[in-house]
Amino acid sequence: MTKICDFDDKMNYIGDYSSTGYARLAKSLIDIVKEQQAKLGYRKEIVRLYYPLSTLRHFFECAGDDNKIAAGMISEQQMLEILAPNNLPKQLTDTIGEIKITAKNERFCIEIPPEGSEYVHENTADNEFISELIALVGTHGCTMEQITELFYKYSDDIEKKDMQNGEFDCYIRFLNEPDDTYYYCFHDEGCHIIYHRFLPQDYADFGF
């Protein structure tokens, strides 16, 4: 496969790295690791995260035309090539480390080394909102009113909508927070409230 992206001989991306699929992937990985560390605490250990091919396609096909690595629908094999060790930019490996990728039936396992977990713990700012949300939904008697108030604590510009798909009751999202574009989907299970968050493109794919 021919790459359109340009790298120097040290694998530094010499274009606008921040608009590449690699940067989008790195942000997603860091977001999830931070969420896990807020839930479970920090350990310097391997973390394995799983992505469907459709999500990885969004990362790389949503970049500007000059930064696309492959045109059209990226296949599983093409994605494995994109994420091969010799194709990973130094900007990515300097943060979350030398990730390892495997795939089966369009489901990708991304293995982050212990150094990546350590980097997230020591070099990224705590996500106070996520920490508070996790603590809130973990308390007995938590209500959607309390959750909504928490969102308003961090922004006056949010959107909350009911969902009628049988899986979630509603979603809330920040409208003008470029670092947090997730749809936070909530379901009241009676004894407690659970949530899952989705990137906008994935939320659209699910057709909720």
Region spans (language model):
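Short alpha-helical segments that sit at the start of domains
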Residues: C5-L40, A125-D126
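Amphipathic alpha-helical segments
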Residues: S75-Q77, E81-A84, H140-D156
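Short glycine-rich, basic-tinged beta-strand/loop micro-motifs
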Residues: G41-G64, F129-V137
